[in-house]
Amino acid sequence: STINEIVEEGMKAEKRKYLYKNLWIEKELTMLFGTTNTGKSLFAVQIAEEIARNGEKVIYFDYELSEQQLSDRYENADRTGHYVFSENLIRPNLDMDKYASYKERLKKLFERMEEASKLGIKIFIIDNITYLNPKLSDGVEASKFIINFKSKMEVLGVSVLLIGHTPKEQKNKTVLTLDKLAGSKNISNFIDSCFAIGKVEGENKIYIKQLKARSCAISLDENHVLVGTFTKRDDGLFEFAEEGTAMEKNLLKGKTDITPQKEHAFKLYQENYSYRKIASMIGVNDKTVKAWIQDYISYHNVKSYNYMDNNEIGLNNDNNNQLYSV
């Protein structure tokens, strides 16, 4: 087929829905990640409930909480009742799956998704990715896993939101990028879209940032992150209460550790030294240098072209912040 024929055929298909804002689109594999205690699961449940309230059946595969823990979370303050979820929101009992090997766990998940798909259920949230494969820090393993996962869901024609995490050593004082996702590029290269939750330093607030989108323009970028707080309503539901948008660097300003050493590394990068050369000059490894330079650029909202790397980096054209991702 020619490209024109493919486009024309696609135009005849039913337009895909935006499942939640422009962060998750129908028939796409989307990742939500953040550090511990940022409210990833609370937000994922809120997303699932909103979709279910709009008439779509959603299955939430929860490998994190026991049924009692879930009950405790969503009961009201005086324990006389609980939040009444939509009947379209389904949560299978996965207690026995937790004791299986991760390979067996993944096999059972695919079987459940296939059975549900035959019944017309096409929207799934999985909390979280670590239970499906604990070896995602290995680049080769991560690539094999995510390619296999995406091929399975494409055959079924389903939409999946995967909950991820950041490596434990990551701190909240740096800007959110795809590099902060555990598994890094080996996962992020193959997902369709990605958004993340960050902490506002010094306040009991969080923010949402859009990091990748294949099918739409990125709206919640570093200049317009969505700020809010998680509050428990009187009816028992935890809700992300939106307060407006802000520049990410302002939420971290005065907290991000931009040291003289990082500034020196950035100046050397502007002088067209490679990451490896800068690392040898300063006495750290090249990955550290790259992270320092990205932090500096994100914090100061600047960009730089390096002829040695043949790569221009900056907030508006960094691979992590493309208008459309490829």
Per-region residue spans from a language model:
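Phosphate-binding/switch region of NTP-binding enzymes
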Residues: 31-33, 37, 42, 55-57, ...
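Conserved inter-motif catalytic segment of the P-loop NTP-binding fold
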Residues: 14-15, 19-21, 25, 35, ...
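Hydrophobic positions on the alpha1 helix immediately C-terminal to the Walker A/P-loop
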Residues: 43, 47
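Active-site catalytic microenvironments for nucleophilic, acid-base chemistry
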Residues: 50-54, 296
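C-terminal regions of RecA-like/P-loop NTPase motor modules
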Residues: 117-118, 155, 200-326
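N-terminal pre-Walker A segment at the start of P-loop NTPase domains
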Residues: 1-19
